[in-house]
């Protein structure tokens, strides 16, 4: 994983790159000779700093998806809301989807800014026990595009993990971008020493989504990231009047259930399609408090309980 010094030029290739200290972007950089010698490619000292910072966080959960648009950030937001309903639990939500930060909108925090304190960056609070951090809080407008190369993304993730003053936290949920990219490698590398409970992988029933989830599962196994389980999102539509279920996205190859059986992965549950979930995300409100008795809410609660049970067993 390429890292980038704080005082590096904009297009720094990263200290682990074969071009470190040699590319045209390195001209004039104060670190050029160090990078060219290979001395900068050693273990990142930030790993130990992050390990110490994360010692105050009991459980760390990554939320992954193979493909965009399957409801990964929606799940992350509602996992945080669901866990925070227990007022005795301190919950933190970290958005590392650097180029597509949707968590501020979903949590009703659009327009909020990061504040610096003596102990680091202060997260933004939704409730007294629910804190959020996102690159979206660093943008002057939610419409601003983040056009960064991998090393700069890695530097931002490192800063989030090392410099945000979460305090004592029971659950840290990390919402990642879709796929398997620099951001995922960064989070896994930096948090592995601190102990990650595991990953929750989000999919929809169609094979076009499942084929990318299989890649995500292989990624987790290669980097030795435990898999808590898979959630099948948009799994049928339950009519609010007649209560009959219709398959909007038919599971042509058996859906997440068959895939989990084939790959020996736990299926945490299925969340039915509910337009009110999207409405809650658009308005920045918790679906649990807006529609507490809907089939989707009940499914979410069962899934969250299974995640909690898994984390408690790992203690």
UniProtKB/Swiss-Prot annotation:
PANTHER family with a match to the protein in the record: CYTOSOLIC FE-S CLUSTER ASSEMBLY FACTOR NUBP1, NUCLEOTIDE-BINDING PROTEIN NBP35 YEAST -RELATED
Keywords: 4Fe-4S, ATP-binding, Cytoplasm, Iron, Iron-sulfur, Metal-binding, Nucleotide-binding
Species in which this protein is naturally found: Xenopus laevis (African clawed frog)
Subcellular location: Cytoplasm
Subunit structure: Heterotetramer of 2 nubp1 and 2 nubp2 chains.
Function: Component of the cytosolic iron-sulfur (Fe/S) protein assembly (CIA) machinery. Required for maturation of extramitochondrial Fe-S proteins. The nubp1-nubp2 heterotetramer forms a Fe-S scaffold complex, mediating the de novo assembly of an Fe-S cluster and its transfer to target apoproteins.
Gene Ontology molecular function terms on file: 4 iron, 4 sulfur cluster binding; ATP binding; ATP-dependent FeS chaperone activity; iron-sulfur cluster binding; metal ion binding
HAMAP family per the UniProt record, alphabetical: Mrp_NBP35, NUBP1
Protein's gene: nubp1-A
Protein name: Cytosolic Fe-S cluster assembly factor nubp1-A
Cross-referenced InterPro entries: Mrp-like_CS, Mrp/NBP35_ATP-bd, NUBP1/Nbp35, P-loop_NTPase, YlxH/NBP35
Cofactor: how bound: Binds 4 [4Fe-4S] clusters per heterotetramer. Contains two stable clusters in the N-termini of nubp1 and two labile, bridging clusters between subunits of the nubp1-nubp2 heterotetramer.
Cofactor(s) the protein requires to work: [4Fe-4S] cluster
Residues given in the record as ATP binding sites: 66-73
